[in-house]
Amino acid sequence: MTVSQIPIAAIATAPGRGGIGVVRVSGPDVGAVMRAVCGRALQPRHATYLPFLDARGNVIDHGLALYFPAPNSYTGEEVLELQGHGGPVVMQMLLSRCLEAGKDIGLRVAEPGEFTRRAFLNDKLDLAQAEAVADLIEASTEAAARSAARSMEGEFSKAIHALVEKVIHLRMLVEATLDFPEEEIDFLEASNARGQLTRIREDLAGVLKQARQGSLLREGLSVVLAGQPNVGKSSLLNALAGSDLAIVTPIAGTTRDRVRETIQIDGIPLHIIDTAGLRDDAADEVERIGIERTWEAIRHADIVLHLIDAADYIEHGISETDDHIDDRLSGQLPPGSPIVRVINKIDLAPSVGAMGFGGNRPHVVAANGPNPTEIWISARTGAGIDLMRSELLRLIGWQSGNEGAFLARERHLIALRNAESHLELAEASASQHAQALDLFAEELRLAQDHLNSITGEFTSDDLLGTIFTRFCIGK
């Protein structure tokens, strides 16, 4: 038997107790399981309330049974779904009974994601839609769930297919010019091939922009709170989270280890990490280890908020220690990850200090040369917290109220960027016309391959295995 000819079964609902639990069976000849467990054949696509029977005819449970003939099912195969009471013992008994009834047809327990993988292999959905199924299940915000649902409905795939069709059309023109060089008609000039390529690149840029937004919804951002001891990092974490997660005292070095909390800003998950204060003279070994872990968190951060005491900053400007922290942050952060100075405790700061500027009101100072963006707040009173949220969204390029976004993964962004690079090379080769038509055609082909990898039309088995094994068992 091939994989598609072997029937599979699994508990499709989450582990634990619940009002309803579902056992799903998919594959050829599941009618044998249906008749054994349900006691009779079922009318296709109709829910039937009946007892589920063991091998001796004793009742395991009462529930709903649904039978979907191929190809009109989730997997494209015959599917039987048994909906009973959601206790773990009952569900395991029902699954065991299905496996027992299906032993003659080779029924086995499904691997993680195998139902959805079969749906993909049977053309019930493409790879981007299949990934969206898992993303919908794992969505951590309402906005992420809505975007995953749009991807599952095919919004992302439609955008990719539209790009691929345009690339194919342009490839046809280039191939025609290569195959019939003696023709008097210049296919590329007659069809404005360069204009077509420009429009394709513009369309791709639009899809990539939407995909970046979707990636923010799915992945969220890692935001590290860093700075010297006792500058209000834990207070800021509590203010952003809306609860007292971290211990706050006037004693420097209170936070010894990282404290992590996930919050939402406009639907984007922000993973806020409070860290040990940064100083050279750690009080003890525990604090030293905490500082090392701070720098480890910084090396994986998307944004670092460098907190600075407002009163000291107004009186003396950036201190030598904070300037050194900024320099080290620049060297430790991943490329493209911004540093934001958060000037905290403005409620305790004078209106005008020795440096000649005021700081007892919330405001933002835009980045200027080597100086990063500054946000002036009071974590204790909450002044400026909403301003900070808005500024963080601006810094990451988030478009508020972007209801049209679809969810995207890192591999999608990589594929889109690779396609973008090949289209750029295609445009460069097009300027050489006849001398580089072969190169022009090849770059278009490579761009098409990268786009097709998103929907699974050109995808390695290794990638498929990686994607589907991350699903839950019953999906």
Swiss-Prot record:
A GO term for molecular function: GTPase activity
Comment on bound cofactor: Binds 1 potassium ion per subunit.
Residues reported in the UniProt entry to bind Mg(2+): 234, 255
InterPro entries assigned: G_TrmE, GTP-bd, GTP-bd_TrmE_N, GTPase_MnmE, MnmE_dom2, MnmE_helical, P-loop_NTPase, Small_GTP-bd
Subcellular location: Cytoplasm
Cofactor: K(+)
Presence of keyword Protein biosynthesis: no
Pfam families in UniProt: MMR_HSR1, MnmE_helical, TrmE_N
A cellular-component GO term for this protein: cytosol
Entry EC number(s): 3.6.-.-
GO biological process: tRNA methylation; tRNA wobble uridine modification
Keyword check for Ribosomal protein: no
Binding residue positions for GTP: 230-235, 249-255, 274-277, 378-380
UniProt entry keywords in alphabetical sequence: Cytoplasm, GTP-binding, Hydrolase, Magnesium, Metal-binding, Nucleotide-binding, Potassium, tRNA processing
Record PROSITE patterns: G_TRME
Residues the record lists as binding K(+): 230, 249, 251, 254
Domain TrmE-type G: from-to ranges: 220-397
Chain residues that bind (6S)-5-formyl-5,6,7,8-tetrahydrofolate: 24, 81, 124, 475
Family membership: Belongs to the TRAFAC class TrmE-Era-EngA-EngB-Septin-like GTPase superfamily. TrmE GTPase family.
Oligomer status and interactors: Homodimer. Heterotetramer of two MnmE and two MnmG subunits.
Biological role stated in the UniProt entry: Exhibits a very high intrinsic GTPase hydrolysis rate. Involved in the addition of a carboxymethylaminomethyl (cmnm) group at the wobble position (U34) of certain tRNAs, forming tRNA-cmnm(5)s(2)U34.
Protein name: tRNA modification GTPase MnmE
Gene that produces this protein: mnmE
